[in-house]
């Protein structure tokens, strides 16, 4: 294939699947689930258990799709497990007070149902306990329940998942057992509404098969949006290793959020992002030595074998490994580590010293956590093991230094991300205590929700909750016939570049959009730059979008993803214009509004599309505890959760 053929969109390799552009497939169901990740699977299972006929549309392969498609090593917020010593209600109140702009309602639901969701997985075939007594007698183990805990062995809130690598196949088998119709390789491109009108009841979705290009129309009484959060808005480079370390699954582009926006759903926290991020400079996730997260509480030593001291949250030295997992320790390697390097007290490189760890901790880090964490089971645990790495003998280099410009592995300041995780949530759909969005018939779960921050258990719990509520709603309404004009308009939009010549590939289109976001909506923003950014995005729509070539269904999928990222970028800029104040918590800096976190701006900014205009509004940070809701988490949960029983201690 010549370079000129590639540039003009000709000369693609022969496509291995039958191509059926334009062919329509019409289906009808009670509950439609958009996205078959963790949230979507739990939603579909729970809706089916409530008697609903359920269809799942998944862009990838549900058996291993989503951010946790390859596994999970620890399961957080399990406050109702039999060995937990922490009070759920107090923890929820404390979390809501400490973490503004994190949706406390979602955190509470996660705390209430996290352990239930884990035991659900156990019931379906994922044995998460230490049933073979490999860790008998270890401080991390509760002898009665045989549960292994992580991070804090006193409160016992985080559970190590012995067979977490198998979580998606377990969920997939349960979907099939319940008769859920799973349509893999179907990417949702738009939502159906009553009469085809924006702001009306959502009655299903439209999409394409990413292998054949055929069109799907699914009519549903209730729709659950569980497609993941958007990524690749500021950083786009698929060719360099490590490019996805901060982006979750690079296939998560936010097409669900974009589809909901276009029919008038209310979004919030869209102005939030963080940076700089690794981009193409990152190390493979957890594939280097570390003292945190999956590697916690591993010893660190310098090149001469000198141990890096650990401290608690008050700065007191923790002498023993066991002290690091004590209640309220807040254990971390000394924050003085970089100064110690500069003073010559620590000699680079540093290493994660697995051989010096107590045997149970060493086996837990390498054989349990690394072996079940989705990002590491194959690329780290399997590959390193096959190469001869032995955790009983070998240390692993830990790239910790700020002596290099920007720090080891960091990208430029303009490289940002909106990916949720680590107790940090950003933009998405606004929901109420029923997981219902601002549009009738549309529910949301997982990272599709604004402020969702619970990681894997957050997805599982909001998914099972939304599944129950959507099934309830579906039982009370009739099906409506989709609007033919809305379907035809969507088909015209998605197929407009099929068969057309062009000189722009989808990668160039995506990279160009990301570059505009870096320049005009980076770490420091102003009204003039943001409005200039909107102009440039519109210019891309008018020019490069109409010059993009689509040679097969795969490129059609990527092209439509570019359109979704364009839409998400426009929403982000509009949200950034609406917040006329800076915020340290949001990592949001307006140079023309430099005051940091003024009280009058301590609120959620909301946006929706109405009559082709962006309409902004606001919600109190605790809107879920304000009228018309009750004033406590417990009262609201018990009034809305639609759960008859809860597994508890």
Where are these regions (language model features)?
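Extreme N-terminal leader/targeting segments of oxidoreductases
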Residues: 1-31, 645-647
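Core beta-strand elements of the Rossmann-like FAD/NAD(P) dinucleotide-binding domain
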Residues: 26-29, 212-222, 438
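Conserved beta-strand-loop-beta-strand element in the redox core of flavoprotein oxidoreductases
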Residues: 193-216, 223
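Mobile, glycine/GP-rich and aromatic-enriched active-site lid/loop segments adjacent to catalytic centers
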Residues: 4, 123-190, 195-201, 269-455, ...
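Long, amphipathic alpha-helical stalk/connector segments used for oligomerization, subunit docking
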Residues: 475-554
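N-terminal Rossmann-like FAD-binding beta1-loop-alpha1 element of flavoenzymes
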Residues: 31-56
